[in-house]
């Protein structure tokens, strides 16, 4: 994970800023984490990121950059930092297509208070700096997600959306999130690595539905699937079309009624908001498509169960192989060797479509980098005497997986065992909770942290994220954590979410245990307030590392819960190892009763 020299890029960007009378611009960096926001002035550069990436950012950013650690006391937010730089009439520029309308409004207000100006620049200056180095946009074909996996036809999904538009008295809805477009039309793509989506927009009104996509990406079976019910328009036509459509529908609307508006997701871009006519003509809301997508139907839930059984078998085969290579064969393997072997094993299983994210194969101190990505030639050799953390997942035609297991192949330290067991206890506590309908992931987060907190320990990431069905491995709007958004959406039957507490000591080791769980209705002796009560069903089928468990910290009830889980893991995955004695013996050992 080498530092990236950004001096030339920054110099080129600052030259473009000067030509366009822009004093401050967002964003460019040499940072590869999935969550970061960068701001460049004529003499400064700052990157803001959350606790998952502090360690990674410190390793990757060169001396040109100031790192703003989100959530740390006395560290300004990136908005505050930007507004401070704008003091005295400075102009802050941004490509409006890469910032949400809501974020743009908030930042514009802060900048205005400091006497500055927030300005949309329709050409992306970062792209101009990137120029010929920028990879070509993918041209892979779109595929149909058959109803045997999706259950519900796209016509029915569009009808449901129109009912929501009618309730809200809206002129139409612009679908701007790629996974929402894919889900709505029962289509999948491969334009974004690991995410089966394709570059697209969609516009649905009470009488029409239009898909904006490069038509060359649509083979005949996709066109037949869509039929004559859907209009296909070029991807680049979206902004011009919605401007014209918005004007036409507003002019045709009844002037005696309350003025109807276009509906957009609260994650839609400022550029889309502007194209529709601005705040006066747009109502931002949590996406009704995203809400529907997050509630899986029974076919999708069964697909998630089945793909996690296959994926669990792949992980057990990999962990058995890795232990044998390191301990018995004394092999020298680096972190990428491990990740490559795991992918090779996964590929053998039915309906495998690819990985769902870069495999985090990390040994020792690298395991403390929460979203670590090993690179060949730069990564570490796997040390059998150190913690090994593997966070990985796959895309299958019937579902998406994401599992983290932390292992030790020799003799862990007392602290490693204690930390692992505290994390495991938190993982189980969350999975076993029962809660009334209407409870949010924000309210449940502390359950996973309680045993760490009791020791004065914690972790700097959320406890859970939603997961798609052969879609994005990180899916909103639900999640479990302390983010404000997780306090706004209740967990519902059919949601699939991760349960992944952890603990990390920079420069030493990292621990994370992640199971995928599904929200279901549960029986309780009473139903206070006449509300249904909900709980979780685990679908991950991979053993915990018994070598890292401090049995003295577990209650008898917790041991019973683990034993029942391991019995289920063995019963559901052992059939894959009838001709694989090595993995079968490993699985028997790891799932033996505590």
UniProtKB/Swiss-Prot annotation:
Keyword Iron attached: no
UniProt-annotated binding residues for Mn(2+) 2: 391, 402, 514
Molecular function terms from GO: metal ion binding; metalloaminopeptidase activity
One Pfam family of this chain: Peptidase_M24
One of the GO BP terms on file: proteolysis
SUPFAM superfamilies named in the record: Creatinase/aminopeptidase, Creatinase/prolidase N-terminal domain
Catalysis: reaction(s): Release of any N-terminal amino acid, including proline, that is linked to proline, even from a dipeptide or tripeptide
One cellular-component annotation, GO: cytoplasm
Sorted UniProt keywords: Aminopeptidase, Hydrolase, Manganese, Metal-binding, Metalloprotease, Protease
Protein's UniProt keywords contain Protease: yes
Top class in the EC scheme: hydrolase
UniProt cross-references to InterPro entries, sorted A to Z: Creatin/AminoP/Spt16_N, Creatinase/aminopeptidase-like, Creatinase_N, Pept_M24, Pept_M24B, Peptidase_M24_C, Peptidase_M24B_aminopep-P_CS, X-Pro_aminopeptidase_P
This enzyme's EC code(s): 3.4.11.9
Binding residue positions for Mn(2+) 1: 402, 500, 514
Cofactors: Mn(2+)
Cofactor mode of binding and number, as noted: Binds 2 manganese ions per subunit.
Function: Catalyzes the removal of a penultimate prolyl residue from the N-termini of peptides.
Family the UniProt entry places it in: Belongs to the peptidase M24B family.
Protein name per UniProt: Probable Xaa-Pro aminopeptidase P
Organism, as annotated: Pyrenophora tritici-repentis (strain Pt-1C-BFP)
Name of the coding gene: ampp
């Amino acid at each position: 994970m080498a530092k990236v020299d950004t001096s030339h890029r920054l110099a080129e960007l600052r030259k473009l800023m000067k030509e366009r009378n822009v004093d401050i611009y967002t964003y460019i960096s040499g940072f590869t984490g999935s969550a970061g926001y960068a701001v460049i002035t004529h003499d400064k550069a700052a990157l803001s990121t959350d606790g998952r990436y502090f360690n990674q950012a410190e390793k990757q950013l060169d001396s040109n950059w100031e790192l703003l650690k989100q959530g740390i006391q006395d560290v300004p937010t990136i908005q505050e930092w930007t507004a401070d730089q704008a003091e005295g009439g400075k102009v802050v520029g941004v490509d409006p297509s890469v910032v949400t309308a809501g974020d743009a409004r908030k930042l514009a207000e802060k900048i205005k208070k400091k006497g500055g100006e927030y300005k949309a620049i329709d050409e992306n200056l970062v792209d101009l700096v990137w120029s010929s180095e920028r990879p070509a946009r993918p041209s892979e074909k779109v595929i149909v997600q058959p109803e045997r996996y999706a259950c519900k036809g796209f016509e029915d999904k569009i009808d449901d959306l129109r009912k929501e538009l009618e309730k809200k008295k809206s002129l139409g809805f612009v679908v701007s999130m790629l996974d929402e477009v894919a889900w709505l039309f029962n289509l999948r793509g491969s334009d974004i690595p690991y995410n089966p989506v394709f570059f697209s927009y969609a516009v649905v009104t009470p009488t029409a539905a239009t898909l904006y996509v490069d038509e060359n990406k649509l083979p005949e079976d996709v066109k037949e699937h869509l039929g004559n019910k859907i209009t296909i328009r070029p991807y680049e036509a979206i902004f011009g079309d919605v401007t014209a459509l918005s004007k036409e529908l507003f002019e045709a609307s009844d002037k005696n009624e309350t003025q109807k508006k276009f509906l957009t997701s609260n994650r839609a871009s400022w550029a889309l908001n502007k194209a529709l006519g601005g705040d006066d003509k747009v109502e931002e809301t949590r996406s009704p498509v995203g809400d529907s997508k997050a509630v899986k139907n029974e076919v999708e839930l069964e697909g998630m169960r089945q793909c996690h059984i296959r994926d669990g078998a792949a992980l057990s085969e990999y962990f058995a192989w890795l232990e044998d290579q390191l301990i018995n064969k004394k092999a020298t393997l680096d972190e990428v060797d491990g990740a490559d072997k795991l992918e090779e094993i996964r590929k053998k299983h039915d309906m495998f479509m690819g990985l769902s994210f870069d495999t985090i194969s990390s040994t020792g101190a690298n395991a403390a980098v929460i979203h670590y990505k090993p690179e060949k030639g730069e990564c570490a050799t796997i040390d059998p005497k150190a913690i090994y953390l593997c966070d990985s997942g796959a895309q299958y035609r019937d579902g998406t997986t994401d599992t983290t297991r932390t292992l030790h192949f020799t003799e862990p330290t007392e602290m490693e065992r204690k930390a692992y067991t505290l994390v495991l206890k938190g993982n189980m506590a969350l999975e076993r909770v029962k809660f009334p309908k209407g409870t949010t992931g924000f309210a449940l987060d502390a359950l996973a942290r309680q045993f760490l907190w009791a020791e004065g320990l914690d972790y700097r990431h959320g406890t859970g994220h939603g997961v798609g069905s052969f879609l994005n491995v990180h899916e909103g709007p639900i999640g479990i954590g302390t983010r404000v958004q997780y306090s706004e959406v209740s967990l519902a039957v059919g949601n699939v979410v991760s349960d992944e507490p952890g603990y990390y000591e920079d420069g030493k080791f990292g621990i994370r245990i992640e199971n995928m769980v599904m929200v279901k209705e549960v029986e309780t002796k009473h139903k206070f307030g006449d509300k249904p009560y909900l709980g979780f069903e685990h679908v991950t089928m991979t053993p915990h590392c018994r070598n890292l468990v401090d049995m003295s910290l577990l209650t008898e009830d917790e041991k019973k819960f683990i034993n029942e889980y391991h019995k289920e893991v063995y019963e559901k995955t052992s059939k894959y190892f009838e001709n694989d004695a090595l993995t079968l013996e490993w699985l028997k050992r790891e799932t033996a009763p505590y």
